[in-house]
Amino acid sequence: MSDINATRLPIWGIGCNPCVGDDVTTLLTRGEALC
């Protein structure tokens, strides 16, 4: 589930709102650090 969401969110964020895309990038970076 996490991998699927991580794949879709950046596309949605960048396509709809750069600010959201930045937030998603930060979340993905933190997620990778946790892994």
UniProtKB/Swiss-Prot annotation:
One of its GO terms (molecular function) is toxin activity. The modification (3R,4R)-4,5-dihydroxyisoleucine is found at I11. The modification (3R,4S)-4-hydroxyisoleucine is found at I11. The keyword Lipoprotein does not apply. The modification 4-hydroxyproline is found at P18. Signal peptide: none annotated. The keyword Glycoprotein does not apply. Belongs to the MSDIN fungal toxin family. The typical symptoms of amatoxin poisoning are gastro-intestinal distress beginning 6-12 hours after ingestion, a remission phase lasting 12-24 hours, and progressive loss of liver function culminating in death within 3-5 days. One of the few effective treatments is liver transplantation. Major toxin belonging to the bicyclic octapeptides amatoxins that acts by binding non-competitively to RNA polymerase II and greatly slowing the elongation of transcripts from target promoters. This is Alpha-amanitin proprotein. The gene is AMA1.
